[in-house]
C-alpha cells in the first residue's frame, strides 16, 4: 500500500503532546487486540482488525499500516490513512493543533 501524502489534524493535548521538548508520539504496527474509538463513532470502541477489514486493507498489507500511539503500547490516536481516534479530534476547546503527515524517508 502507498501511505505517503496522507495527513490529519488532531488535538495535541488529547494526544499527550505539548510544546515541551521531548514531547512525542510513537509509531508502530498493529498489535493483536488493539482497540480504538474511530472518529465518527461517538466514543464507541472498535477492534483495529475490524476497522482495517472494513477499510478493505488487504490482509497481506495490514502489518505495514502505520499506527500512531501516545507511547509504546499506548492509546491509538491515528490509524494512518484510515481513521483518527475520536478522543484526539479537534474541538472548540482545542488550544494546540497537531498535524501529522506521512512522508517517504529519503
Role assignments for model-derived ranges:
Residues 1-106:
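Basic, glycine-rich polyanion-binding accessory segments appended to enzymes
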Amino acid at each position: 500500500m502507498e501511505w505517503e501524502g496522507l495527513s490529519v489534524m488532531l488535538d495535541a493535548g488529547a494526544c499527550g503532546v505539548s510544546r515541551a521538548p521531548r514531547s512525542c508520539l510513537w509509531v508502530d504496527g498493529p498489535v493483536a487486540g488493539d482497540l480504538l474509538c474511530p472518529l465518527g463513532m461517538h466514543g464507541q470502541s472498535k477492534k483495529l482488525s475490524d476497522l482495517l477489514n472494513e477499510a478493505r486493507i488487504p490482509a497481506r498489507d495490514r502489518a505495514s499500516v502505520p499506527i500512531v500511539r501516545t507511547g509504546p503500547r499506548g492509546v491509538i490516536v491515528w490509524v494512518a490513512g484510515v481513521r483518527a481516534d475520536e478522543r484526539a479530534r479537534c474541538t472548540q476547546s482545542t488550544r494546540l493543533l497537531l498535524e501529522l503527515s506521512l512522508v517517504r524517508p529519503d
